[in-house]
Amino acid sequence: MNHDIAEVHTTIAGGIGLITLNRPKALNALSLPMVQALLATLRAWRDDPAVLAVAIRGSNKIGRPGSPEALFGGFCAGGDIRFFHQAALAGDAALDDFFTEEYTLNHLIHNYPKPYIAFMDGIVMGGGMGISQ
């Protein structure tokens, strides 16, 4: 089953489940839909005999090739602070949902029964550390 969304791409090749965070303009900051997609993917792969290990990376380059911006990026800058700010001001329950789901994801990764490899290229902060462990 494929749980891809625009910001999270997944594939299985050679026994490796590969997750690519694809939100480079926001340094791959995590949104609630991204966290939910990661949870669904890792839960499915946990019991999939075709997946022997999992690797996660960021699509971490922004800007056109050859420009200074093309060298800048990150694995994951953590949670989406714009969302946090707007949700807090609005009293949006999605803010609580984000942290509940993110900590569930972190717990799943910490106890994952298969090798889990994070390619931490560039900026890694907050929730980026959580999904790298």
Placement of each model-derived feature along the sequence:
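Short beta-strand/turn micro-motifs composed of small residues
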Residues: 57-58, 120
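Glycine-rich beta-to-alpha active-site loop
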Residues: 109-133
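Hydrophobic/aromatic residues within transmembrane alpha-helices
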Residues: 19, 56, 80, 131-132
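Conserved CoA-thioester-binding segment of acyl-CoA-metabolizing enzymes
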Residues: 1-57
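Hydrophobic core positions within the conserved protein kinase catalytic domain
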Residues: 42, 106-109
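Glycine- (often His-adjacent) and acidic-residue-rich active-site loop
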Residues: 58-104
